[in-house]
Every structure is written in C-alpha cells, then in structure tokens.
Amino acid sequence: MRIALGIQYDGAAFCGWQSQPHGKTVQDALERALAEFAQTSLHTTVAGRTDTGVHGLGQVVHFDTDLDRADFSWVRGTNAFLPSTVAVQWAKPMPDTFHARFAAFERTYYYALYVHPVRSPMLAARAGWVHTPLDVDAMREAAEHLVGEHDFSAFRSSECQAKSPVKHLYQIGIRPDGDFIHFRFRANAFLHHMVRNLMGCLVAVGRGRYPASWLAEVLESRDRGCAAPTFMPEGLYLAHVGYPAEFAVPPAQLGSVPWSSVWADLDGRP
C-alpha cells in the first residue's frame, strides 16, 4: 500500500530536508516518528528537498507499507512522535502510479521579504530582510525576462544534481504589502538554490545596482558567476506541489502563515 502525507515544518529548526548522519533534518524527524508509530522502519520519498532555513507548507511525501491504518490514524499517530516544529497535515492512500516527486507537474514557492531600516527579531526566521527600499516596478520588469522555458544554469547551485538545467518558469508574482514585498515563483520544477538565486538577482535590480535588462543577460550567460549571490533562506516557503487531478491530493493549508491572503491574491491561485 502506498501512503501520501502532507507535511508542514519550520525550516529554521532543521538542517534541511534530506537525511543526514547527525539526524537533524526534517526527513530524519519524520521517519523516526513513523517508525515509532508503525513499529517498523518506513522510508519516505519527498516531492522536493528543501535547504536549511527553508519552510514547508505544502510538502508531500509517500512511503510503501503493509500496514492498514485509517487515514487520520496516520496523521494523529505520527504527530504524537514529532517535535512541535513539524506536523503531518493529511494522509491518503494512493495507487502505485503515484510518486511524490515524479508525479508532480509543478511547484510553487513564496518568499516573504521584510523591507525596513531595522531588522525585526520577531521575523528573524520567518522572512528575509533588506534595509533599503526596493523598486517593485523594476523587479517586475526584470522578472518578465525569466518567465518561460529556459536553461537556468546561471541560477543553479554548483551542488545541483538535476539532469537538465532547462525548466519552465510559469510565473513570478511580486506584490508589496506595507513593510513587506511578497514573491511567488511557480514552475514545473526548480534547480538547487534556483529560487534563492533568482531572489538575489531581483533584489539587486530592486536596489538599483543593475537595470531590469540585466536579468536577460544573466539568463543568456548560463554562468552562475554572472548572477547575484544566493539570497538568504529564511523567507522562503515551499507552498504547493501540483499533481494530476486523478490523485486528488489535498490542498496545502496556507492559513498557518500571516501572509496567506496576500499570497492568494498574487495571481488568484492557491
């Protein structure tokens, strides 16, 4: 039997998603909890591995098991053994054709950026921060150069293991909201550090260091050295993983963050 789980977690509490010998990752915490509840080892496959500091609102995993438990039993039973910084939101039996990673056709990330002369301790692990105003119109113009199917080599980490740097970036939405600017990135898939590298470049344009057309030059160069430094992880949220309707994957619960209404308005999609 294949079971899918919807997971939320505070990325600041973990050293990324992928299991490590030190055991301080989200995958390690989840698999320990599953083992306690199921009384057997269960290996999880994830939709998208996130880095240290990156949060998960709509993460999806699957595992195979011979155990027959009610859906909500998996939720409550696993959560009983998880730390407060990670929680299973839903559980659902799936056909063998479902795969958390390979069945997904799109991913959506949001970035919450606090723009203020003084940093906020209350937002230290929840939002990125810049101390100077940003030109939103310039960033929007720059983002237009990135939308579409491109070779995103200039925005991939040197540690990226993706077979191809070609991805289809469907949308970049940018919306100011008081002292915040919110960003929405939706694509069929993302390279390692791709969203944070895009953020670094957009912020550089917003600060006036480069014109909006610079993003087209960086993209065309396919050279990571031509782009801005990787932006901080704290404001980044994996919010949604899209699957074919036949799997009826439950939607992510974005209401757990204070900016959910702003995010929903970026283009009218969850």
From Swiss-Prot:
Catalytic site: D51
Entry-linked InterPro entries: PsdUridine_synth_cat_dom_sf, PsdUridine_synth_TruA, PsdUridine_synth_TruA_a/b_dom, PsdUridine_synth_TruA_C, TruA/RsuA/RluB/E/F_N
GO MF annotation: an example: tRNA pseudouridine(38-40) synthase activity
Family: Belongs to the tRNA pseudouridine synthase TruA family.
PANTHER family linked to this entry: PSEUDOURIDYLATE SYNTHASE (PTHR11142), TRNA PSEUDOURIDINE SYNTHASE-LIKE 1 (PTHR11142:SF0)
Catalytic activity: uridine(38/39/40) in tRNA = pseudouridine(38/39/40) in tRNA
Subunit (UniProt): Homodimer.
Broadest EC class assigned to this enzyme: isomerase
Residues that hold substrate according to the record: Y109
UniProt EC number: 5.4.99.12
Protein's name in the database: tRNA pseudouridine synthase A
Biological processes per GO annotation: tRNA pseudouridine synthesis
Sorted UniProt keywords: Isomerase, tRNA processing
Main function: Formation of pseudouridine at positions 38, 39 and 40 in the anticodon stem and loop of transfer RNAs.
